[in-house]
Amino acid sequence: MEKFTQKWAIVSLLEDVEEGSEFYFTDFPLHVTLAGVFSTPADKDQLVHGLAGLLRKQSLIEIEADEADFFGPNEDIPVMRIKQSGELKKLHLQIHDWLTSLHVEYNSPQYQGSGYHPHCTVQRDTSLSLGEQRVLTSVSLIDLFPNNDGYQRKIVKTIQLG
């Protein structure tokens, strides 16, 4: 029996998905991860208000799909790496520093902060193409344990950029 606990992630969705939407973990919309899976003693309201304050003056960020690759312990998760721009790195580090102040524990801390590798995981029905350019227009807080269900995901809050 798997044991699930409250976890969160912060992403920039590349598809239009309404705030409050729930979906099965295998149906995650196309996105760029800005903060990987984490737990924290902070509650949902603290996360929502803190993230909104942090992003208050954040401008849109242009991204470009740079290289196909495989992630994961078995290198079997197909991803499209995103070119690491100064703006994207700065956004990740701002989020990382803020989360550090909330005493988060990451599932994979080696990929946060200086170990951040921006990417877009290939989803069932969609992915980025090599060289494809997009604009990050929002940042979303994702609940990875809505209604005590570790297989569901919920978009708790989406904050528009720019």
Task: Give the positions of each predicted feature.
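A two-mode feature
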Residues: 148-152
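Basic, often amphipathic N-terminal segments
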Residues: 1-64, 70, 85-143, 155-162
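Short histidine-centered catalytic/ligand-binding loop motif
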Residues: 76-87
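Extracellular/luminal beta-rich ligand-recognition
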Residues: 73
